[in-house]
Design a protein with these regions (language model features):
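Transmembrane helix boundary and interhelical loop/hinge segments in multi-pass membrane proteins
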Residues: 19, 75-100
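Hydrophobic alpha-helical transmembrane segments of membrane proteins
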Residues: 55-82, 151-153, 158
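Aromatic- and glycine-rich beta-strand/loop motifs that create alpha-glucan
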Residues: 1-32
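Alpha-helical transmembrane segments and their short interhelical loops
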Residues: 102-178, 227-251
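Membrane-interfacial helix-loop-helix junctions in multi-pass membrane proteins
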Residues: 51-54, 189-245
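Transmembrane helix segments
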Residues: 39-47, 164-211
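Hydrophobic alpha-helical transmembrane segments of multi-pass membrane transport/permease proteins
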Residues: 21-47, 60-75, 118-119, 180-186, ...
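Short cytosolic juxtamembrane segments of multi-pass membrane proteins
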Residues: 252-259
Length: 259
């Protein structure tokens, strides 16, 4: 067990060192959701959005939950990129030939992506606070937001790793990534509530796990525990099922890739 933990720690630090060498990429990844979605998009539609429709004090307050989950989405779907590059340059094959627990490779990636995403979410909530958005559920609510984000992120990272192990080139990977990310964002309650969507889009959005994550986080920010506790148990159950299915698919893809 001690050896297993050391393997996970060493591989996780490898991802950290790689990220620290890519300072521009790290900075862009951090500021992109805040700058584009929260600040530009939020302020652009601040006066256009009807507070009666979004049921929030202002549009930035409404949008914050969406930006949090969009950050989880983008990081999760990109979580397999480094594994794909390791596969393409032969490092993954060499790593698998060593006496290392194979699951430590996967777990280290989950740990890295989850940690980076959680830090980003905290920064986003901090910036939102500067715009007057204060989570109605306090610090405990922030912890629950991180938990929901982590649960959603695990499934997304599993999908990303399954793609990384299955596709033949990074070109195919990024094509699928682009195809998945934008529809998931626009067919969710990230930017507008379900009640304001066309009927067909609202029906599709209900099937989107991103919508469930957003609708669990939004009351934690806007209204407080009374409203937040209602969907929380259902969302946790949905996320557990979502994660289980995604992890099963990722495990099968991993076994095929190294088999």
């Amino acid at each position: 067990m001690q050896e297993y933990r050391q393997e996970i720690a060493a591989l996780t630090m490898r991802w950290v060192r790689r990220l620290s060498r890519e300072k521009f990429s790290m900075l862009f990844t951090l500021i992109q959701p805040m700058l584009f979605w929260l600040i530009f998009f939020g302020n652009l539609f601040q006066r256009a959005a009807d507070v009666q429709v979004v049921q929030a004090p202002n549009y930035i307050s409404f949008l914050t939950a969406g930006v949090v989950v969009m950050t989880v989405l983008n990081n999760g779907l990109a979580g397999g990129v480094d594994l794909l590059f390791d596969k393409e340059n032969g490092f993954l094959e060499r790593l698998m030939s060593t006496p290392i627990h194979r699951t430590s490779v996967i777990l280290s990636r989950f740990l890295f992506v989850t940690t980076v995403t959680s830090l980003q979410v905290l920064v986003i909530l901090g910036v939102a606070f500067l715009f007057g958005v204060q989570p109605a559920t306090g610090f405990l609510g922030v912890a629950v937001i991180l938990l929901i984000g982590m649960m959603f992120g695990v499934g997304l990272t599993a999908i990303s790793m399954a793609m990384a192990f299955s596709v033949k080139s990074h070109g195919d990977f990024f094509s699928v990534l682009g195809f998945l990310s934008l529809p998931m964002i626009f067919l969710s309650s990230a930017l507008v509530p379900l009640s304001a969507m066309p009927k067909l889009m609202a029906m599709l959005a209900v099937l989107n796990p991103m919508t469930w994550a957003i609708d669990a986080i939004r009351p934690l920010i806007l209204t407080g525990w009374t409203e937040a506790l209602r969907p929380l148990a259902i969302v946790v159950l949905i996320m557990l099922v979502f994660d289980a299915l995604c992890l099963y698919g990722s495990a099968k893809a991993f076994r095929r890739a190294i088999g």
